[in-house]
């Protein structure tokens, strides 16, 4: 019986940590985020907000986006589009913001935006390491399926390619199957589960667990 209480504790702490662990990407209104990790990007935020957000998992992520700053000329607003960019990066438990070039006017933007330098920066202003490429499609550009293009790009193994969603899902569900097998197999079920979840916990969770046991 004594093993059940600490087991419940570490399970709760581990699940809580997994639920809150995420990367928040802030997307300004002059950036169109088409795809995140192979899926059409679903942003949160009010209609007229200057930026919106999307929650991404910790670890490696891939995005497809386009930058389009606008410039006033008389009564008109002129937008200048960058290339469609596919990029991958890794981050954990942080907020990220785009750091994008600013241009004096639309003429300068038209000359320079295709070779623009950009970054993703964290809460401390440090740039996140990334790999990027252009997501190029010849011919008609209207009605592009960016999710499909990203999947095709990943198959080519480009510098910004990531693994498929299927392999990620398999990795995530595998520990659950292992737990179920252990529950059915052994007489020492509680102890085995305790060891399993303790090994999976991060150092902060392990420290809290040890403090709880020593009470």
Curated annotation (Swiss-Prot):
Entry keyword set: Signal
Q: Signal sequence: where?
A: 1-21
Assigned protein family: Belongs to the UPF0319 family.
NCBIfam families to which the protein is assigned, alphabetical: PRK04517.1
Question: Does the keyword Signal belong to this entry?
Answer: yes
Q: What protein is this chain from?
A: UPF0319 protein VV2_0960
- This protein's species is Vibrio vulnificus (strain CMCP6)
The portions of this protein that span the membrane are none
Question: Origin, by domain of life?
Answer: Bacteria
Recorded hits in InterPro entries, A to Z, give: UPF0319 (IPR018635)
A single Pfam family it belongs to is DUF2057
């Amino acid at each position: 019986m004594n093993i059940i209480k600490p087991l419940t504790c570490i399970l709760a702490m581990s699940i809580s940590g997994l639920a809150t662990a995420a990367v928040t990407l802030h997307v300004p209104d002059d950036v169109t985020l088409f795809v995140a990790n192979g899926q059409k990007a679903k942003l949160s935020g009010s209609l007229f907000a200057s930026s919106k957000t999307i929650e991404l998992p910790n670890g490696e992520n891939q995005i497809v986006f386009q930058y389009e700053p606008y410039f006033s000329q008389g009564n008109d607003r002129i937008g200048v589009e960058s290339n469609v960019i596919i990029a991958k990066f890794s981050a954990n438990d942080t907020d990220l913001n785009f750091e994008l070039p600013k241009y004096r006017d639309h003429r300068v933007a038209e000359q320079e935006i295709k070779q623009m330098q950009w970054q993703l920066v964290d809460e401390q202003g440090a740039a996140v390491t990334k790999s990027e490429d252009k997501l190029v499609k010849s011919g008609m550009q209207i009605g592009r399926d960016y999710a499909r293009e990203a999947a095709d790009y990943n198959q080519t193994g480009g510098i910004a390619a990531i693994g498929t969603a299927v392999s990620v899902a398999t990795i995530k569900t595998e520990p659950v199957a292992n737990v179920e097998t252990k529950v059915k197999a052994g007489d020492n079920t509680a102890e085995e589960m305790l060891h399993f979840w303790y090994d999976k916990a991060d150092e902060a969770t392990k420290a809290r667990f040890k403090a709880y046991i020593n009470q």
